[in-house]
Amino acid sequence: MIGLKKGRYLASTATSEGDVAAAQALRARCFGLITDADIYDDRCAHILIHRRSDSALVCCFRMMPLTGTDISLSYAAQYYELSRLETYDGKMVEMGRFCTHPDWQDPDILRVAWGAMTAYVDAEDVQLLFGCSSFAGIETADYLDAFAMLKARHLGPSHWLPRVKAPKVFNYAARLRRKPDAKKAMLRMPPLLRTYLMMGGWVSDHAVVDDEMNTLHVFTGVEIQAIPAARKRLLRAVAG
């Protein structure tokens, strides 16, 4: 169970159907959906970030514990062929449905969220954190420098790299020949993915075109042992 107080915010694990329903409602609002509930919710720990002054829910995400042998049950496995990760020797967790309330963009919210994630990973002895990192919209032309940067610096190791499964993908690693403009790439890189990369994360060599969610997304993996020591210290300082 997560119970983390930092400044104006409190991170906790959902303990009731009402807590999960509140997270689903925030997700629906953030993702522009009428509702947002799926078969994966029951398998996950839901982490909620509330504002302490009035208990307003300002951020949420979910964590699904897995191992290599059951990675095919993950949300990401709908879109990526993950058989190479079936032999991964260590505990995994899929982090998903991360969102922050559109009216609350305080950077401290993200710090507390990452502190809560760190507390969960440490408590469960997780070795691999993974998920789908999304770009808003489905126009690949908007993100060519970002994708070129991913190709140049952040592709996953070949022995773990997901294969293509989804019907619509952008094979950016094979198609792009441009040298990335680093400034433009970072400006267009989604904040969540940018944080993963700062932690030593790696990505798939293709992006999935998700028409239902109106996003492009890449599979993202963070091997906990590969996180830079200074970054680990910062995260654990927040986690308390």
Where are these predicted regions, by residue range?
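Short amphipathic alpha-helix that is part of the acyltransferase structural core
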Residues: 2-59
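Short loop segments at secondary-structure junctions
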Residues: 52-54, 103-104, 224-227
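Nucleotide-cofactor and metal-assisted catalytic machinery
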Residues: 62
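Acyl-donor binding region in acyl/amide transferases
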Residues: 66-202, 207-215
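C-terminal "cap" of GNAT-fold acetyltransferases
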Residues: 214-227
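Long, contiguous binding/interaction regions
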Residues: 226-235
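Short, cationic low-complexity segments
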Residues: 238-240
